[in-house]
Amino acid sequence: MKKILCLILAVLLMLSLCSCTLEDLLNIRSPKDYTLLGDAKLVVHFIDVGQGDSTLLESNGEFVLIDAGERDCGNTVVDYIESRGCDELKYIIATHPDSDHVGGLKTVIETIDAENFITSETDKSTSTWLNVLHAVDEYDINYIDAEAGETYSFGEASFTVLAPLSDSYNNYNNYSVVVKAECDDISFLLTGDAEKESEDQMLASGEDLSADVLKCGHHGSSSSTSDAFLSAVHPAFAIISCGENNDYGHPHRETVAKLTNRGIAYYRTDTLGTIVAATDGKGISILSHGGTQVEAETISKEDLNNGASASEAAFPYVGNKSSKVYHRYTCSGVKTMNDKNKIYFDTKEQAVQKGYAPCSLCNP
């Protein structure tokens, strides 16, 4: 019965997608309104769970959940998953046993059917983690020990495990299950809390780490996203999952500087809320759900391969909410602007319509 219901929901969703415009996507107000581009083959939802991590991948009616934030975020994640018309997860991936990643998984497992559970082996035995493992056993979910090189399919997409590459680390963050999700020409590298030690091992493995979208490790901490790793991934876009005014100072200024200096467009859940990336396998649209909207435009793989900066290609103009002045993306004034003050425009006309005046320095 569940599979029949899923099929009906999938058909209804596809019908709704056909009439959806980009303007519709930018005017969303709740998760259920994420009726995405009609030709999207893979949609990746970076769910806002505060200072934590939770990512939902969907393709052709099949779903993968990576982490679920702290324990008190379990219902938030469940509500979001169900709003996507999902009543069964093909895979749950627990990147590592830290509570800000796995705390909400017990609630997810108790509420939504799941086929497979993938994680790495550690000796961590907190009550939060043990409760998750007990739930996996109680609900008879197939347990899979993450092994680098293994590939799993869902819908029209797949993901490959790239890490961990050792069974012994001093820091639990480096046990993080790192996966590369792919759909035709577009790929996403999702790194959990993997830090430099794990990144160095991935670099040494010889695996292809390149990806169009990178979810920065450890909430944008300076302990992750090393220069060498960032060069190997060479992303057009980066996602940082962190909580507003968190106690750790995430994302760290070093990470933000690396992304900015390389022209990588980055998006933060603490300022944008839930962030959604949709791809048809040839291009990417980045959309936001929250207090601030991203002016989104689909960037083709061809443009990215030709060396276009994703930041400049998608959002050529950046406005300052305080001064009501808009700038070229490359203006020096943008580099010193507080992220929370930024609003993005893809045309000068949009900026003017919203009451923004041109910068006298860069003369956009």
Regions found by a protein language model. Name each.
Residues 2-4, 17-313, 335, 360:
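Non-globular, low-confidence helical/coil segments that flank catalytic cores
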Residues 7, 111, 354-355:
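Generic alpha-helical secondary-structure signal
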Residues 9, 13-17:
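Hydrophobic core
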Residues 11, 177, 324:
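Residue-level detector of short, conserved catalytic/binding motifs and their immediate flanks
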Residues 289-290, 295-364:
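Mature, structured domains enriched in cysteine- and short glycine motifs
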